[in-house]
């Protein structure tokens, strides 16, 4: 008996949005010959408009950084950022239009959450670029784990050996750490890199910085991330934005040490440009 949640993929669906499917899904539907031809056209040749469900709306250049604005079929736009490094190019992809999380330092959620991006819309942020990238980071607009199924599907498509064949160790998901999804990613056989946007060492402070994560226990989030690291033998990154007067005290340093000392963890301390949250913290550039 077929699972009630099973989606029957048709040739019409593939023709209308081919970037949303793996080689196996396409092959099962249209046969090996057509599947190989289509995958070659999608991932080995110059991008063709007839296969695209989005387009480059604008490009902003700034030194080693290039920001793309992509216009989606429904008229909404998302941003994708390319960063040149000594060892290649990193692309930072979006997973949502808007964001439901509401981090006080981030503009992505200023207009609230509008919708999730499809697997195809995530994949096209990589394939339509002018740059050839060797690292993909899921940390643009949106919280990747609140669009879990589409994000995981996009990774399977990007890793497909018959397509882009992107290496797993070149993929990183940055998340604020919803517990259910952290448990799910632990059981996936993807072995991707993981970054936890922590930004606090106690519940009260994290609830201020990430107000829409109030229902998630900070200690359990840390435990889950460390469990992922141990299970997959992967170094995880802890992103910690230093906000003067809010999360930069000696007690914060000590708590970070208690959690992560002798663990397979990289703590990435980030400096914030104060003005936008000066009112919240009582800090100004003159302090």
For each predicted feature, which ranges?
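Canonical Radical SAM [4Fe-4S] cluster-binding loop centered on the CxxxCxxC motif
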Residues: 84-120, 128
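Residue-level structural signal for beta-strand termini and adjacent loop
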Residues: 82-83, 150
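Conserved AdoMet/S-adenosylmethionine-binding subsite of the radical SAM
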Residues: 131-135, 140-286
């Amino acid at each position: 008996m077929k699972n009630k949640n099973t989606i029957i993929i048709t040739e019409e669906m593939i023709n209308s949005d081919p970037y949303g499917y793996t080689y196996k899904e396409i092959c099962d539907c249209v046969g090996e010959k057509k599947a190989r031809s289509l995958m070659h056209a999608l991932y080995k040749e110059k991008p063709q408009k007839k296969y695209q469900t989005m387009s480059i709306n604008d490009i902003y250049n700034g030194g080693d950084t290039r920001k793309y604005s992509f216009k989606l079929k429904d008229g909404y736009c998302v941003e994708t950022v390319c960063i040149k490094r000594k060892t290649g190019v990193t692309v930072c992809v979006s997973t949502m239009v808007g964001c439901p999380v509401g981090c006080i330092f981030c503009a992505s959620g200023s207009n609230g959450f509008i919708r999730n991006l499809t697997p195809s819309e995530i994949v096209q942020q990589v394939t339509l670029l002018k740059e050839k990238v060797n690292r993909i980071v899921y940390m643009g607009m949106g919280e990747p784990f609140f669009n879990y199924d589409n994000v995981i599907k996009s990774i399977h498509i990007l890793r497909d050996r018959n397509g882009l064949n992107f290496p797993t160790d070149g993929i990183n998901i940055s998340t604020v750490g919803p517990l259910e999804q952290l448990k799910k990613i632990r059981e996936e056989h993807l072995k991707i890199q993981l970054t936890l946007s922590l930004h606090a060492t106690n519940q009260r402070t994290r609830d201020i910085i990430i107000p829409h994560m109030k229902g998630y226990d900070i200690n359990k989030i840390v435990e889950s991330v460390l469990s992922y690291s141990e299970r997959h033998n992967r170094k995880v990154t802890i992103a910690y934005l230093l906000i003067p007067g809010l999360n930069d005290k000696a007690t914060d340093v000590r708590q970070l040490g208690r959690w992560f000392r002798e663990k397979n963890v990289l703590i990435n301390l980030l400096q914030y440009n104060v003005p936008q949250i000066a009112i919240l913290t009582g800090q100004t550039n003159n302090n």
